[in-house]
Amino acid sequence: RDKNGVGLVKEDLNYLSYLIDWTHANSMEFHVTELNYWLNNENPKSISVQKRQVISYNNVVNTLISKKNNGVVTLNIWGLFDRKGPGDFPKNILSLYDQNGNPKQSLYAIKKSLINESTSLIFEK
């Protein structure tokens, strides 16, 4: 798996798409239950990290939207606020709001995708 996140790797998104199709073909629902963005040793406030989070969330959500007419798809966010990992984990866990409760670009990207029913994916070189 790429260190930057599943939503940034075409092969991972293709596999997600395949899993959703398989689930629907077998008369089951598909649920993403813990979407968040984990970081090791990177500044969670850096522009590059924020941009990767937006693209990753955009791609996961848009993949789900592309499958909505084939069966049930759902998305749950694991925590609303950016936070440190539990225990001795040296990581930051990013979500839709910063630690002060301010909405982040990832929230606006998800809202835009849902409103526009977007299915396009973004891949950077």
Annotate each language-model stretch with its function.
Residues K3-K125:
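Aromatic-rich peripheral "rim/lid" segments of glycoside hydrolase catalytic domains that contact
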